[in-house]
UniProtKB/Swiss-Prot annotation:
HAMAP family for the chain: PurT
EC number: 6.3.1.21
Name of the protein in its database record: Formate-dependent phosphoribosylglycinamide formyltransferase
InterPro entries registered for this protein in UniProt: ATP-grasp (IPR011761), ATP-grasp_carboxylate-amine (IPR003135), ATP_grasp_subdomain_1 (IPR013815), PreATP-grasp_dom_sf (IPR016185), PurT (IPR005862), PurT/PurK_preATP-grasp (IPR054350), PurT_C (IPR048740)
Catalytic activity: N(1)-(5-phospho-beta-D-ribosyl)glycinamide + formate + ATP = N(2)-formyl-N(1)-(5-phospho-beta-D-ribosyl)glycinamide + ADP + phosphate + H(+)
Principal EC category: ligase
Length: 393
């Protein structure tokens, strides 16, 4: 039975969030609504989730000793990783010592590294995936490309948001894709995965929540990527009943193997009735931002309920809905957003501005949300709202 105490008192239920981006911010807001005391930790000050938490700490998230020191001082009831770039070995140790990691330390560890999760899905669970090789050297990588043929995809085994990812179409791309992968890895230069290209019709994120009452799926989320980064998403993605059932089977197998409680974003490729597993995040997913307008319980509310052991009897979906990101390019520590009245002038629209403290290059700084009579209309409306926002650097 779940019992939640009073924040900032001896009875408080404490959650420590590792990583404080826009997804973490929404998780914190949902936890705050349930009277949870939230401590936010990231590598830079004034990160979005820190702005809505009770207090925060700035540390190098890959420094196991620093992470342990904060967790031992705060004594949280739940440790909730929101990003991949964390000292996962320390989380494994802390879990063994009695701390609760969401969903589990093993899930966080396996999914930080594309190799761990790919081998689990393809080799242990025997799920359909693209053909793949791993390589540590340019020589092995070149052999793998030759073996898989063109087109193929290369990614660092440890990276996020599409960093270091390339689609190779010919021998001209081999060297530059290798160089880009070496720059884009979270832990610096190193191992890459080379995947055969699947000629899919579309890709989806199946938001899958493991909670006290079992496993529940949100309606499938379709999305469009550019250079591995999400640009827009929509829900529900139209699918055949066979493809949807197979997607749910694959998502359930992967999330069951990872264990624990919480929301998972399972990425899948779909061609007709065929489904291939791509990746999984053991936390809310950027493409799932659409659920802020498309569902009565957003992915963030679902994650909060699952963490706290609260039931999820039903997820109500409101019909065709879409999200379109607000990308900012340039350099600023005082970005402002104008023309918001025009952006919100149509019915069934909403904005989320993330409050990120700076932009240096290109950064996702907000998202526009919309509902309409069809997916096409909802996507167009969300895009209009996003484009209407005027960014002042």
């Amino acid at each position: 039975m779940t019992r939640i105490g009073t924040p900032l008192s001896p009875t408080a239920t404490r959650v420590l969030l590792c990583g404080c981006g826009e997804l973490g911010k929404e998780v914190v807001i949902e936890l705050q609504r349930l009277g949870v005391e939230v401590i936010a930790v990231d590598r830079y000050a004034n990160a979005p989730a820190m702005q809505v938490a009770h207090r925060s700490h700035v540390i190098n998230m890959l420094d196991g000793a620093a992470l342990r020191a904060v967790i031992e001082a705060e004594k949280p009831h739940f440790i909730v990783p929101e990003i991949e770039a964390i000292a996962t070995a320390t989380l494994v140790e802390l879990e063994a010592e009695g701390f609760t990691v969401i969903p589990t330390a093993r899930a966080t560890s396996l999914t930080m590294n594309r190799e761990g999760i790919r081998r689990l899905a393809a080799e242990e669970l025997d799920l359909p995936t693209s053909p793949y090789h791993f390589a540590d050297t340019f020589e092995d990588y070149s052999k793998a490309v030759q073996d898989l043929g063109f087109p193929c995809v290369v990614k660092p085994v440890m990276s996020s948001s599409g960093k270091g990812q390339s689609l190779l179409r010919s021998t001209d791309d081999v060297q530059k894709a290798w160089d880009y992968a070496q720059e884009g890895g979270r832990a610096g230069k190193g191992r890459v995965i080379i995947e055969g290209f699947i000629d899919f019709d579309y890709e989806i994120t199946l938001l899958t929540v493991r909670h006290i009452g079992g496993t529940t799926f949100c309606a499938p989320v379709g999305h469009r990527q550019e250079k591995g980064d999400y640009q827009e998403s929509w829900q529900p993605q139209a699918m055949s009943p066979i493809a949807l059932a197979e997607s749910e089977r694959v998502a359930k197998a992967v999330t069951e193997a990872l264990g624990g409680r919480g929301l998972f974003g399972v990425e899948l490729f779909i061609k007709g009735d065929q489904v291939w597993f791509s990746e999984v995040s053991p936390r809310p997913h950027d493409t799932g931002l659409v659920t802020l307008i498309s569902q009565d319980l957003s992915q963030f509310a679902l994650h909060a309920r699952a963490i706290l052991g609260l039931p999820i009897p039903l997820i109500r979906q409101f019909g065709p809905s879409a999200s379109a990101v607000i990308l900012v390019e340039g350099q600023s520590t005082q970005t402002a957003f104008a023309n918001l009245g025009a952006a919100l002038s149509e019915p069934d629209t909403a904005l989320r501005l993330f409050g990120k403290p700076e932009v240096n290059g290109q950064r996702r700084m907000g998202v526009a949300l919309a509902r309409d009579e069809s997916i096409e209309a909802a996507r167009a409306k969300a895009t209009r709202a996003s484009k209407a926002v005027v960014v002042e650097l």
